[in-house]
C-alpha cells in the first residue's frame, strides 16, 4: 500500500535530475546527462536512408526529391507540435487546470511553414487536437476507476549510466496495489511489425524495428530505471494511443526489462 514515506522516497530519488524543456536536455547533479532514453534506443535502430527512399517516392508521385523531403519535415514538425500541445493539455488536466490551445503558437508554426498552409489548416489543426483530447478523456474515465496519479511528466534518470527520461503518467493502481506507467502516443499509427521484416541491430537484433517495439522498450527502460533507483516494482506499462478515429486504444507493452537492463548495463561509465 502506498503511503507518504513512499511518496517522499520517490520524490527524493530523482531530485538531482533536471530537464530543460527549451533545449530538450537533461542534467544530473548540474552536469549534462549523456543521453535520453529515446537517444539510447536510437542507437539500436537501423538508420533511415531518407534520401534514397525519397527518390523512390518522388519518382512514384511526380515530385522532386526536395519536395518529398520538405513534406516529410512538415509532417514530422506538425506531429511534434500537435503532440506537445496535447501533452501540455493533459499535464494541466491532471492538475485540475483547464487551458485553451495556444493560438499564437499554431499561427507562428504555420507562418514558418507557409508553403503547406491552406485556408483550412488552422481549423483542421483544432479538429486534430480535439480528437486527441476526446480520446484522452475517454481513457481518463476508464483510468480513474482503479488509478490515482502519482506523477505527471515525471523526470527520472540514472546517475550510473547518465540516461534520463520523462514518464508521461506514473499511476498507482489502488485495486492491485502497484505502480503503472502510461505513455500517450499521438502519431498516425503504431506499427506492430518491422517494415519488410526489419529488425533492430546489435544486441536487440531479435526485435522488430517498429513503433510497438520501440515504445515498449522506452517504457521498459523507464520501469528499469525506477526499480533500480527506488526499489519500487513497476510490473506493467501501457501505451495509450489517442489518435484513433473512434476512441483511444490501450496497448499493453512487451516485457523488455531483460533487454532494458542489458543496454543500460552497457552504458555504465
Listing of model-derived features with the role each one plays in the protein:
Residues 1-160, 164:
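Nuclease catalytic cores
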Residues 99-100, 178, 192, 228-235:
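Substrate-binding/catalytic groove segments of enzymes
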Residues 159-160, 201-205:
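Gram-negative outer-membrane beta-barrel domains
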Residues 87, 165-173, 177-201, 222:
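Conserved catalytic cores of phosphodiester-cleaving nucleases, focusing on short active-site segments
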Residues 126, 208-269:
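Metal-dependent nuclease catalytic regions and adjoining charged, substrate-binding loops involved
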Residues 157, 186-189, 244-245:
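Short, solvent-exposed loop/turn segments at secondary-structure junctions
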Residues 157, 172, 240-242:
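A generic structural motif
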Residues 1, 95, 154, 160, ...:
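Accessory terminal regions of nucleic-acid processing enzymes
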